[in-house]
Amino acid sequence: MFEQSISTLAQKLRNKDISSVELTRLFLARIAKLDPQLNSFITVSEQHALEQAAAADVLLQSGKGTSLTGIPVAHKDLFCTEGTLTTCGSKMLHNFVPPYESTVTSRIQQAGAVMLGKTNMDEFAMGSSNENSFYGAVKNPWNLDMVPGGSSGGSAAAIAAGLAVAATGTDTGGSIRQPASFCGITGLKPTYGRVSRFGMIAYASSLDQGGPMAKSAEDCAHLMQAMAGFDEKDSTSADKPADDYLANLNSPLTGLKIGLPKEYFGEGLDSKVADVIMAAVKEFEKLGATVKEISLPNLQLSIPSYYVIAPSEASSNLSRFDGVRFGHRCDDPKDLLDMYTRSRAEGFGTEVQKRIMVGTYALSEGYYDAYYLKAQKIRRLIKEDFVKALEEVDVIMGPVAPTTAFGLGSKTSDPVAMYLEDIYTLSVNLAGIPAMSVPAGFADGMPVGLQVMGNYFAEAKLLNIAHQYQQHTDWHLQTPTMAKGA
């Protein structure tokens, strides 16, 4: 049951082959059995989930509901959920229960989905390995000694292990795509502004974007149907009608023009990962696509640009956590300054403190022009590279990450090695375009994701491309051994 698609489960719920309460209990039992090994959930909301499932059953009984009604999903723990702990993976918010619901979780709830709980993540979404969480590292279900990727590692691991049918994630520099690649699932980072950021705790406001994570492109499309669309509560929301993401999944790919950026296949890319990606591209050629080499000349500049812009925005966003209104407050402060200083020192982990310091430095007088302004100019060049390339081709393909999942603790002492894991994903966020990670095979027994990048608001096209690939391959149907034992 845990391996079945949203469409199949929705049909079973409609036919009364199973009730939402039974389905929810099945997933809660799997979480109880398997998650102690994975640590993919921070909060499991058992009672709330069963209440939602019972309400979904009543709705289905009357012949109403959507394709998500009664389907058990999980949410990354930076989406505010009214009445349910929302920690952002940080000690700073270890006791924060939001008084309101984020737009993303609200829309999925209105579609009738059941919330199993909140998934683990790198603290304030800062990390590429899910080792920066106050609640402990998440393990990769394919190999418990490996990282699941970050920062949405809990969501990716939970789906791969069959602890949730689908989940929400967020992507600031690859945080949906990289864990999706490492855990062998499908993930979509939408165009900036396509999915509301209201109630999504901010890391870097000009880069953050919520998106769906699931086993397949079709399941991601079901989630996008609920998530996408204009939201007046979010000033960065795109006032443009959302597409029907399910309507064109079966469109043929004949004549599709694929660009392969030479910069994505150079030094640093593991040769076994490259082989998997090229085999996937050949599959697209069989489906009627044509392939040409393109260039994104400023790719190498995406890391220095991103690691100035994102920490700068984070230092501003995270200044609100000072021990006054909400979040962690130190014991017995001597005065106001002592309370600010100690609350932040105690509440934030090392990586978050590091990025706040970098951002504050980059924005400080005398350095703003040298760092922040220059990084924004580079960002413009990167965006222009994509715009130019997407005039020649329909989509751009390449690897999501230079390697498969790496060992827990293997890169924590080398921040540059950790940051280089994001080399192929950061530029997409800087440009604001949509991109997906699609399971494409294995290297040394670990999953490899194919990255598919498209033009602004072309999510429906990306989902169509990924779905057609998944109709002719079965990489997305592979299940880790540990998941089969429950």
Swiss-Prot record:
GO terms for molecular function: ATP binding; glutaminyl-tRNA synthase (glutamine-hydrolyzing) activity. Pfam families: Amidase. The active site is at K76 (charge relay system), S151 (charge relay system), S175 (acyl-ester intermediate). Keywords: ATP-binding, Ligase, Nucleotide-binding, Protein biosynthesis. Coiled coil: none annotated. InterPro entries: Amidase, Amidase_CS, Amidase_dom, AS_sf, GatA. Its EC number is 6.3.5.7. One of its GO terms (biological process) is translation. PANTHER family: GLUTAMYL-TRNA(GLN) AMIDOTRANSFERASE SUBUNIT A, TRANSAMIDASE. Allows the formation of correctly charged Gln-tRNA(Gln) through the transamidation of misacylated Glu-tRNA(Gln) in organisms which lack glutaminyl-tRNA synthetase. The reaction takes place in the presence of glutamine and ATP through an activated gamma-phospho-Glu-tRNA(Gln). Belongs to the amidase family. GatA subfamily. Heterotrimer of A, B and C subunits. This is Glutamyl-tRNA(Gln) amidotransferase subunit A. It comes from Marinomonas sp. (strain MWYL1). The gene is gatA.
